[in-house]
A protein has these predicted regions:
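Conserved ABC transporter NBD signature motif
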Residues: 63-74
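Conserved ABC ATPase "signature" region
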Residues: 74, 126-145, 254
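P-loop NTP-binding/switch modules centered on Walker-like glycine-rich loops
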Residues: 55, 174-180, 184-266
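A short, proline-enriched helix->beta-strand linker immediately N-terminal to the Walker B motif
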Residues: 169-173
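Conserved ABC ATPase signature
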Residues: 149-154, 158
Length: 330
């Protein structure tokens, strides 16, 4: 049994006179200890996927179809009381802004102790011992002193390490990390990612890493889902997707990486922008930006099917496939 199994997950947002589709029948599995990257531009549906997995969608968003099974239990429609026993305990989420997680008026120690006591029958002293141990695990110096501090007294990198420590408090089997380093300095980003990778490898925790950065995905994950306009358009081994992308959008993302451009040259870009939820075109959602698009692409939505070593949703994949090194871009 997979740790996490998602089938035909569809999420909609109720608007004044219509509902718009934010996730369109996405499916994937995550095995125990596996690290999965979800990548795409802003508006692709990455964060909505993460919030759906945690059953944290707020109105006007709602799951309109599909299943999310965590260790065999379907969490779609699960009562909040039952979900609380899973969320923060067996599943945990790391947000891109640590101040979303941390309460500014409580000390770090108060927040960690409250989290532990909400899920376990332990004393305050026992909870503080566990909190100190977890802070040491994420390489926070003088952890006993940090328990008495407030979030605003700590640096951004230190706050994010504490958020990771809180996520690990109850030894979860799955961590969902939503752009966990976006708000941090570049050098601190690398440290946090290295820490997260080390912790997942040592404790065999499953990881869903949501990011716009293919470079991060290449270093952190075993498999990758590429999302566009609420759909999965390419899925497979991270190594295969990075080295030999099949979808023109994925090719464009990789060609836009700084290391793909010679010094002094302009960075490559994918022309156009991601459509808004109420403007997703008929057919392939990427067709308005794709130089390979045909009338068939513009009229008929492609299914996600096996091609070579990955699953890809593209009518023209047989015609256009070429190694990234040949300069093919979307």
């Amino acid at each position: 049994m997979s740790l996490l199994s998602v089938r035909d997950l569809t999420v909609k947002f109720a608007m004044r006179d219509q509902s718009v589709t934010a996730l369109n029948q996405i499916s994937f599995d995550l095995e125990r200890g596996e690290r999965l990257g979800i990548v795409g531009e802003s508006g692709a549906g990455k964060s909505i996927t993460g919030f759906s997995l945690m059953n944290l969608l707020s109105k006007p968003g709602y799951i309109s179809g599909g299943k999310i099974q965590f260790q065999g239990d379907d969490i779609v429609g699960m009562s909040e009381a039952k979900m609380r026993k899973i969320r923060g305990n067996r599943m945990a989420m790391i947000f891109q802004d640590p101040m979303v997680t941390l309460n500014p008026v409580l000390t770090i120690g108060q927040q960690m102790v409250e989290t532990l006591k909400a899920h376990r029958k332990i004393s305050k002293a026992e909870a503080e011992q566990i909190a100190v141990m977890k802070l040491r695990q994420v390489y926070i110096p003088s952890p006993e002193e940090r328990l008495a501090q407030y979030p605003h007294e700590l640096s951004g990198g230190m706050r994010q390490r504490i958020v990771i420590a809180i996520a690990l408090l109850l030894d979860p089997e799955l961590i969902i990390a939503d752009e966990p380093t976006t708000a941090l300095d570049v050098t601190i980003q690398a440290d946090i990612m290295e820490l997260l990778l080390e912790l997942c490898q040592s404790s065999k925790v499953g990881l869903v890493l949501i990011t716009h950065d293919l470079g991060v995905v290449s270093q952190m994950t075993d498999r990758t889902l590429v999302m566009y306009a609420g759909r999965i358009i390419e899925a497979g081994s991270t190594r295969e997707i990075i080295n030999d992308p099949q979808h023109p959008y994925t090719q464009g993302l990789i060609n836009a990486l700084p290391q793909q451009t010679a010094p002094g040259q302009r960075l490559k870009q994918i022309p156009g922008t991601m459509p808004t939820l109420n403007e997703v075109p008929k057919g392939c959602p990427f067709s308005p930006r794709c130089t390979f698009a045909t009338d068939h692409c513009r009229s008929t939505s492609p299914d996600l099917v096996r091609h070579a070593h990955v699953d890809v949703a593209c009518h023209e994949v047989n015609r256009l496939h070429a190694p990234v090194s040949e300069g093919q871009s979307a």
